[in-house]
């Protein structure tokens, strides 16, 4: 999944400081998402990782708020409904884990992703929540679960 993240983020100009590509957990997702109230899901086709997404407690946020994190897909997996299915799976997992709100950060230019989030019921926020360290992101959304 680290390779997917490192392939996709530069496509959108998101490779510098303040972006998730630089998070230490990128190389250790299985460790980061084995924590309580966290989960990560991976899309694999013919043995190749094509994308994934996870949820975890929002750093610096209320305990009933999770963050949708590291949702990225290689180009060949986009436009087929995979993102919609995986997003729904993450939302259902967040509910099962007892969260009441799901937050996410993205950026200008990730228009398809923002459309997907809006279609799923996420609402735009005026500013960031928590302390994710992703100061380069400029779009914020939340979904009441």
Predicted regions mapped to residue ranges:
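Residues that form or flank phosphate/diphosphate-binding pockets in enzymes
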Residues: 63, 81, 112
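Conserved G/P- and acidic residue-centered "switch" motifs that form tight phosphate/ATP-binding loops
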Residues: 47, 81-83, 98
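Acetyl-CoA-dependent GNAT
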Residues: 2-76, 87-89, 93, 126-130, ...
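Short, mixed-charge, low-aromatic patches
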Residues: 1-2, 97-101
